């Protein structure tokens, strides 16, 4: 079912930029289009929204609806708004992504020490498989058609073309409808990829769901490190096998992830009842197809901010290639508030277009 949404650009911003002669605002684009402004100086990802490049870029905003935990109470569905800006250099695309979220969710499936000294992995009691909405992380995702066969249907249906409800999972399964259709997926995972500065570069093809051979249906990762973006920490003799080198509890100044190479043998004596520790070791994606998209993330005043970069042309068959500056490139956006799959989304397609140099 299509959800209602609103696209908007800031009239005040357009007027201001027109006065200073910004090339981008002299170019007319449709209300559903995000105009990438050419810049000779790349934005500093770590500077967030304050980098001067973003003051010259026109925003595009879209309403996101139907996402778990975005409502007034935990678990309730609600809405958010995402605001996007884009810029490009001779060989790179940059995007500023900001959306409202009242909570910064970081407690992704931690182990917690119990009163009797045992360790328990915290999990949503209502989760029947792949649907945790209590102990998870904040995420966002973008989908990009990679070829004309995919774009033709995406133009009509947006992200909904790949969402198939009523197929064993609360939010269905994700796959394209025809052989040859391929969606490039940028999947920013707040605790698994974001801390190392990566967006998980994935894709969606026409693989149907099979509980044994294709539990994720058509959603797959680009070629990357062995084990994927993270490795789970197991319980050994009732205790987590590893802990972070600093031996801090995650809920007392530590983190809910362990960076690869920072794991050490677990020392139970370092923790007291109620302490929580990470259940994941996160792997760097650098130097792999899966690590093509970089990000710098921050959270403040109820707002997530990501500054993203990717080569215009990666050469990967799993990626959208921004090779033709005269084309428009369809995309969709979804935000996840402490939810594994129950995302808030704008189902109608948006389009990235490139301004003149």
Task: Report the location of each language-model feature.
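Bacterial N-terminal signal peptides that target proteins for export
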Residues: 1-10
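C-terminal motif of bacterial Sec signal peptides marking the signal peptidase cleavage site
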Residues: 18-21
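Short, well-ordered beta-strand segments enriched in hydrophobic/aromatic residues
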Residues: 47, 92-99, 304-310
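Beta-strand-rich interaction surfaces with strong enrichment in secreted/lumenal proteins
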Residues: 72-73, 82-85, 293-299
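N-terminal onset of structured domains
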Residues: 77-93, 98, 104
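Short alpha-helical segments and helix-capping/turn motifs at coil-helix boundaries
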Residues: 78-82, 124-129, 291-293
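Extended, compositionally biased non-globular segments
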Residues: 257-322
């Amino acid at each position: 079912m299509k959800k209602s949404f609103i696209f908007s650009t800031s009239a005040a911003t357009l007027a201001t930029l027109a006065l200073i002669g910004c090339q981008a605002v002299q170019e007319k684009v449709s209300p559903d289009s995000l105009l990438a402004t050419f810049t000779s100086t790349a934005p500093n990802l770590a500077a967030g929204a304050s980098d001067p490049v973003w003051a010259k870029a026109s925003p595009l905003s879209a309403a996101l609806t139907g996402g778990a935990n975005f409502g007034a109470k935990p678990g309730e569905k609600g809405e958010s708004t995402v605001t996007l800006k884009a810029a490009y250099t001779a060989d790179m695309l940059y995007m500023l992504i900001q959306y409202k979220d009242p909570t910064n969710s970081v407690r992704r499936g931690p182990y917690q020490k119990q009163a009797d000294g045992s360790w328990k992995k915290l999990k949503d009691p209502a989760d029947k498989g792949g649907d945790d909405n209590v102990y998870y992380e904040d995420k966002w995702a973008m989908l990009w058609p990679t070829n004309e066969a995919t774009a033709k249907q995406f133009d009509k249906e947006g992200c909904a073309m790949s969402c198939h409800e009523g197929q064993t999972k609360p939010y269905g399964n994700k796959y394209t409808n025809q052989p040859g259709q391929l969606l490039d997926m940028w999947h920013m995972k707040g605790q698994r990829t974001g801390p190392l500065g990566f967006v998980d570069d994935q894709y969606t093809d026409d693989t149907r769901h099979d509980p044994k051979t294709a539990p994720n249906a058509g959603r797959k990762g680009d070629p990357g490190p062995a084990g994927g973006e993270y490795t789970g920490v197991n319980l050994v003799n009732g205790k987590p096998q590893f802990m972070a080198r600093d031996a801090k509890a995650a809920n007392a100044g530590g983190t809910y992830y362990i960076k690869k190479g920072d794991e050490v043998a677990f020392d139970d004596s370092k923790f007291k009842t109620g302490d929580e520790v990470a259940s994941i070791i996160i792997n760097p994606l650098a130097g792999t197809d899966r690590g093509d998209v970089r990000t710098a993330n921050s959270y403040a005043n109820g707002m997530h901010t990501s500054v993203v970069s990717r080569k215009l042309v990666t050469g990967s068959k799993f990626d959208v290639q921004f090779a033709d500056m005269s084309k428009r490139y369809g995309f969709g956006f979804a935000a996840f508030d402490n939810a594994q799959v129950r995302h808030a989304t704008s189902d109608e397609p948006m389009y990235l277009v490139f301004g003149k140099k």
